Amino acid sequence: FALAKSGATREEMSSFKNDHIEEYVTDMSLERVEEIIDHFVQAAKAAKDVGFDMVQVLGGHVISSFSSGYINHRKDAFGGSTEKRAALACEIVKAIRKEVGEDYPIEYKIPIHDDAVPCGQGGPELKELSVFVKQLEFAGVNAFQAAMGNRLNINDTVPPKSHADFKGEGCFLYISDVIKKYTNLPVSCAGKFSDPKKNQECIESGRLDYIGMSRQLVADPEWVNKVADGKEDDITRCIFCNRGCLGSLLSREKFHCVLWK
């Protein structure tokens, strides 16, 4: 679960457009940085207190902005080198670990920026994953999930079926392949996983240790039970249109899937 509060208040977010995020991140006070870290800690604590078995730290939004060399131009401990741009993510993980204890699992979802595809600028680059993965593991992460990061268009991080660069299931597997080079921790991946056979192949081949699904579970919350019962033909397969699930969130309408009957 991505249980994190936005780094900016609603009033702050309304005061600038995406074009101003570089200035916002670069000029953010250290006091504000500490507040953001505490937001993540309190969210993780709340998740544990109500009984969740683990938490996922979503390294997007304000974290991916700090992680990005395109966006983050700070001159202090939270900006500059790759190591320093990883500092906010690591401090968040360390603080959560201190709060929840050593035995509580923390997964880190690490969205990246890839120059090879026309997506936004959030997150570290593929070549920087060696630094980010190792530092996050040292900070206390138990597992990683691969994803795409951006700050401009939600279709780049949650790719619709029509996206020119992300056709087919498991479209971010090439990112998890890179992460696996730098860690022995469990690695999963998000991005168009609906086919049980494809999922099983990814696990049996060692490309993934487990599968990350979101939209498919919205389309059919019984996906896991149907697979376990051998009723794969009864699965309502996500069509990755983003119209119902994400569309309803962005338009502040009642959350739904266009496939729901």
Question: Where do the PLM segments sit?
Answer:
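Flavin-dependent oxidoreductase catalytic cores
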Residues: 1-261
